[in-house]
Amino acid sequence: DFGRAYCPSQYKQSILPDEDALRAFQREDWIGQRFHHPDIVKTFAPTRPRHYLYLIQEHLEGHSLRAWRKANPDAPVETMIAFAKPAIKALRALHRRETLHQDVKPDNLFITQTGQLKLIDFGSATVGSISENLNLRAGAAEYAAPEYALGVARDGRADQFSLAVTFYELLTGHYPYGDHYLEAKTPNQFRKLQYTSACKHNPHVPLWLDAALARALSLNPEHRYPELSEFLIDLERPNTHLTLKAKPWLEQNPLLFWQLTSVLLLVCNFILLACWLR
């Protein structure tokens, strides 16, 4: 096919000897061919019969988002937000066809030399109609939603959580729930975890962005965005209502706080005066 560059990838039994790895390789080929989206790496069907196992993908030149961030440590927050948008659009394309990526992390978001972001690696992906979905683990535990550790059903909100962890880490250099996240295995252990504001690690992160990340990173999937489209909207147009909810009461109502404090002190003074006059 003239004018088009390919990147063939062959399954090597000596490196990947187990059946799970073989199925992952086949799954990446099959799922990859189902999608033709500008923000998803293209996988092509072979033009001739296969005599050994391989897959063909478009040739990409560039770096993973992790490598890009390392090479650009001073990149502004606005640039990271700009990268988050095509990542969300790519995941939405998957979710519309009942497909979960299950391994969203900085290494699986690729930045081309032209600055375009591509979602790659479908080895851990699942399709809603496949019965083995619950038995498949997510790729990297530090990015995986709690649903995987708890062994419960998951949907697109699990990918949402992983994406939010990815960009939280890229913005701050830390994970949102600290080192104890990987130790949590039960609902009670997850309930004890506390979200750390991204603003604490990086003062350049605006409060509205931290609020959006905090919602997408809710440990309870019911508290995350129902759809990735809503997350995208809050990244494109800052949600002041969400920001207000995320701010401590004192920051939301500083004047009222000091008014109530003054009234309380006045009442205490009257009580002390009454006791002294007795």
Residue ranges and their predicted role:
Residues 83-84:
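Activation segment signature within eukaryotic-like protein kinase domains
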Residues 142-242:
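C-terminal lobe helix-coil module of Hanks-type protein kinase domains
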Residues 16-34:
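AlphaC helix of the eukaryotic protein kinase fold
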Residues 65-75:
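AlphaC helix of the protein kinase catalytic domain
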Residues 46:
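Activation-segment/catalytic-loop signature of the eukaryotic protein kinase fold
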Residues 50-64:
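Conserved short submotifs of the Hanks-type protein kinase catalytic core
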Residues 89-99:
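Protein kinase catalytic-loop region centered on the HRD/HxD motif
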